[in-house]
Amino acid sequence: MNALAATNRNFKLAARLLGLDSKLELSLLIPFREIKVECTIPKDDGTLASFVGFRVQHDNARGPMKGGIRYHPEVDPDEVNALAQLMTWKTAVANIPYGGAKGGIGCSPSDLSISELERLTRVFTQKIHDLIGIHTDVPAPDMGTNPQTMAWILDEYSKFHGYSPAVVTGKPVDLGGSLGRDAATGRGALFATEALLNEHGKSVAGQRFVIQGFGNVGSWAAKLIHEQGGKVVAVSDITGAIKNEKGIDIESLFKHVKETRGVKGFHDAHPIDANSILVEDCDVLIPAALGGVINKDNHKLKIKAKYIIEAANHPTDPEADEILSKKGVTILPDIYANSGGVTVSYFEWVQNIQGFMWDEKKVNDELKTYMTRGFKDVKDMCKTHNCDLRMGAFTLGVNRVARATVLRGWEA
């Protein structure tokens, strides 16, 4: 089941639990706007290259639409649509005043020079600048993009609309980015993990963690878990996977990754098959890479974790979700567990609009407040509807968006 089918399935299950009427259900499911643009740029060698860009603006009942822009060869309309819809429910679960959007360009960033990436970003911005804005749609970084990408979008957008730092988030701090934004998704995943473990009478200290993905999210999660006394026993990235039953020295691993650009070859751990990372023995499994990685095939290989924290978007296939739940594995869903990034993006947007910057402690303290409150809200919905955490999160998000839609008179 692809990401769009799985997301639609979860939405429809939540709508059924909430008793939404069919007209309202349909209006919440269909995107507000789908944008497809062609972007042609001159390459460094003088030839022309053409790329296709997408932006799906799913819903704006609760505020400006919000979501990342990813650069990846496999970007397609269905994936962008699914991720835009997930952003709608995610911002509602976090209770921040946004709707959902997502964008992307089908390209391989590693095959393009810095100047080619800049030209591509500026052309894409030229094509969509009238459809984004501070109070309309606020992009952010995603897979294959970074603060520099956001700086280019800000600059190009400002040529048409005047200097507008709040038009994108995840910017460099020197251009109005927020302190703490780089660690926000990983830190949010830590706070989510703490909330779940506390519910079960446990703490991060002493738990054994396996983390799939050592990019921005996975590496920060590993660092913060290590600082809290958790034992990270295995990690993986695109270069390979490593394991140390006694716990990996995360600070040393950070230095190794900085020098070699991957976890492969780290001296204080032994290599393992990257395909087996999800079934390594641990207490807590954190998928922090691509979607769809936990599926029924993993079940056949016997996932051993007691808890799964979805730091990636849509990492668990619905069939695997059902099987694991029956086995007693507790899954903390992506639309709550990885909402730290968009929450701190909201803080950045607020700071830009106010023209008043927060210190990092305030950012982190506010993030913890939002994540702790979000877990309580999800649990309350679980009790109300007698459902698991995923459906608790979906019913929470869908209900908040549905209420805003009805209050604005859009349901007819």
Swiss-Prot record:
Enzyme Commission number: 1.4.1.3
Catalytic activity: L-glutamate + NAD(+) + H2O = 2-oxoglutarate + NH4(+) + NADH + H(+); L-glutamate + NADP(+) + H2O = 2-oxoglutarate + NH4(+) + NADPH + H(+)
Catalytic-site annotation from UniProt: 102
PROSITE patterns from the UniProt entry: GLFV_DEHYDROGENASE (PS00074)
Ranges in coiled-coil conformation: none
Listed GO biological process terms: glutamate catabolic process
Subcellular location: Mitochondrion matrix
Molecular function, one GO term: glutamate dehydrogenase (NADP+) activity
Tissue specificity comment: In roots, stems, leaves and flowers but not in fruits.
Family: Belongs to the Glu/Leu/Phe/Val dehydrogenases family.
Entry protein name: Glutamate dehydrogenase
Organism: Solanum lycopersicum
